[in-house]
Amino acid sequence: QRFTPGACALGFALYLDELERLSAPLPPVQQQGTERQWLNIALPKGRLGDKAYGLLAAAGYEANENYNETRKLVVENPEAGVRYFLVKPSDVAIYVEHGAADIGIVGKDILTESGADVYELLDTGMGKCRMCVAGPRNFVDDESRALRVATKFVNIARAHYESIGRDIDIIKLNGSIELAPILGLSDVIVDIVETGTTLKENNLTVLEEFMPISARFIANKASYKFKYAQLTELLNKM
């Protein structure tokens, strides 16, 4: 009766092609224990990434193909042991935090807003601007009610107003933040200000500056420990 239709069954299968694939040696750049490991660098697409790459290239970490002309998302220099990932600026800290990249270059605004658990190694001084509270020129804060704040930097705005004990209602927007107080959607905005030209053209003004912004070198915590020599060598050349 052990072999009747109602009996339980146990079986297994071997996929020889899969076993062969898994047992094959890794390409040289992926092998562990080699003399020089890859240093994976996340660069933001756009002007900031171009400037950062220029600094790295000048320090001897230029990619083997034209960085400005390639459409590839990964470029590398095997001789220098570096590999560049080109990602959205808002994703740099995510790649670094989770170990897909060892280091990255990211704006302080994005880094603070994301709350990524990474090491901040160096202020590059690139992309300088300010995180500000801005509003109408004649704005007077009515402390008897919650302040309506429009911003895309929700965590930064909340932390700032918590630090001064001010109740707020946050209105999350993704663009054209300056429009919110003009249309009465918010009392003020929290946003990055570089020159202030857009504010002036819309009859708004900076009411408070509370965070300097610039591009920072960040590192994955495990990578900082296990690739310390490579990281410090790169930073010392910058």
Give each language-model segment a name:
Residues 35-238:
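Domain-level signature for soluble enzymes in the chorismate/prephenate branch of the shikimate pathway
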Residues 1-34:
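TRNA-recognition modules of translation machinery and tRNA-sensing kinases, especially anticodon-binding
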